[in-house]
Amino acid sequence: MKRTNHAFLWMTLLCLVLAGCAARSADPPAESSSPAPVVEEGASGPADFESSAIVEDVSIDSGRGYAIPSTITLPASGQDWPLVVLCHGFTGNRNGDGHFPRVARELADRGIACVAPDFAGNGESALPFTDYTLSGMYDDLESVIAYMRTAYPVSSETLGLVGHSMGGRVATLHLDERVTAVALWSPANNTGSDGFEFLSHTAEGREELLQRARTEGQVEVPSWGVTVSKTFLEEMDESDPCARLEAYDGPVLLAFAAGDSEVLSDDTVALVTRTLRSRDRSFVDMTGDFPEATHNYTALPDSGSSDAAVCRRIESAPVGFLADALLTDADSH
């Protein structure tokens, strides 16, 4: 019996020692003054760089009874950062087809804060898609800008916008003297109802959608798997983003891709480029730089290119452009 008791005691002691070691190994590491590097993965797969950026998912109060799910990306140090807002397209989300996280982290590494919201009915938004409207997105941009300037040491003077497709239209309609620079990827910037040509490629089809929405309050768009509201279509019909673009005096980067033809007309490309060329100042014109890219800036099938190559080019372009525009502007204040 004594041997049995001794064995039992030894086994008990051994278990206690092992448990203590396991508990110590599970303790979280002490906080460091420098955040751990982030290895970015985007549309092109694992990236070839590490970032010191701080990335957080937050829920921003719109002030209108709902939350705006957003991702913020901050520099690891400093203050009075310029701010960039990244605007996704129709039925998209704040990941921006995989492009926005890398753009945001590269900008943060250069000292620029970024925020990417999910617009109503998109991504993690709790709202129905029928709440997706131009006026709602304008208000959401105002809310996220105000939040960033209140919650973080963000400059009140220096603001950049990036917009893809419908996000490009939203960014363009937001242009005024407060916006330092804007980067537009394949903006859906045709005038009036031609602006929702991605819902119907014919004028007759667009008019039918508008009239049905006016009669029923909303209209289903089976090709996109969503129902849009009368408000959305009427606001599109009444808006003229190129008039706002023509009046804007700040730096602009513009890109279009060969694959845009599935969503946007040649008339849209011509109108936007003609508008920018009519201004008194030059712009970064990348309209012919993506013959191998889809509307979402991945490689077209049989193009001989790769998603990684297209992604690197479309993602790096606004980083250099916005860093030059925003950091120079920040230094002047």
Descriptions of predicted regions:
Residues 37-78:
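N-terminal cap/lid segment of alpha/beta-hydrolase-fold proteins
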Residues 68, 169, 179-326:
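The alpha/beta-hydrolase serine catalytic core
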Residues 81, 88-93:
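Active-site glycine-rich loops that stabilize anionic/oxyanionic intermediates
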Residues 92-104, 119, 266-267:
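The serine-hydrolase catalytic nucleophile loop
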Residues 104-126:
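Conserved alpha/beta-hydrolase
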Residues 131-152:
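Alpha/beta-hydrolase active-site loop
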Residues 153-163:
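Alpha/beta-hydrolase fold nucleophile elbow
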Residues 162-173:
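Glycine-rich nucleophile elbow surrounding the catalytic serine of serine-hydrolase chemistry
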